[in-house]
């Protein structure tokens, strides 16, 4: 079931009761174990039913590095959600998924040597260039470097 896009703000959701009303679209049914709202990547039904957040968006694996990367991603997203005042859900369009996702991970705070393996695991299956949004030869600075290298030869 596709639901309409909406904006959530801190003023609108000052406590869990208000968030619960928004999550269930007015039909508060947190007592139902198999509520339809639990089948999303982020299951907030679990918050109202059990008091825990449940992420339902990762493939099963026993690889310790991948599991740690998934946990780090969930913690970073949760931290941003707590600190952020408002949010708008919208699809991001990108010609270079690898670059776009890497930039988002860095914005979440998953930067530096500490999260190198986390980024490696999360970016492993994406196509594109990590460092350059567009073809690196299209940037003026790279054109100058390439030209000077050719002149040296």
Predicted regions: what they are:
Residues 79-96:
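Flexible helix-coil linker/hinge segments at domain or subdomain boundaries
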Residues 19-83:
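Extended serine/threonine-enriched, polar tracts that run as long, contiguous segments within proteins
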Residues 8, 12-15:
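Long, charge-rich alpha-helical interaction segments
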């Amino acid at each position: 079931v596709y639901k309409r896009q909406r904006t959530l703000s801190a003023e609108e959701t000052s406590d869990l009761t208000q968030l619960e009303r928004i999550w269930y679209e007015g039909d508060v049914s947190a007592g139902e174990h198999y509520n339809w709202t639990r089948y999303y990547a982020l299951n907030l039904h679990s918050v109202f039913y059990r008091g825990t957040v449940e992420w339902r968006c990762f493939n099963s694996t026993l690889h310790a590095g991948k599991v740690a990367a998934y946990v780090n991603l969930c913690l970073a997203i949760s931290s941003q959600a707590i600190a952020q005042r408002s949010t708008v859900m919208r699809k991001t369009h990108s010609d270079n998924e690898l670059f776009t996702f890497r930039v988002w991970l860095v914005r979440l705070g998953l930067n530096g040597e500490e999260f190198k393996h986390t980024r490696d695991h999360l970016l492993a299956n994406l196509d594109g260039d990590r460092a350059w949004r567009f073809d690196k030869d299209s940037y003026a600075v790279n054109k100058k470097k390439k030209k000077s290298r050719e002149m040296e030869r």
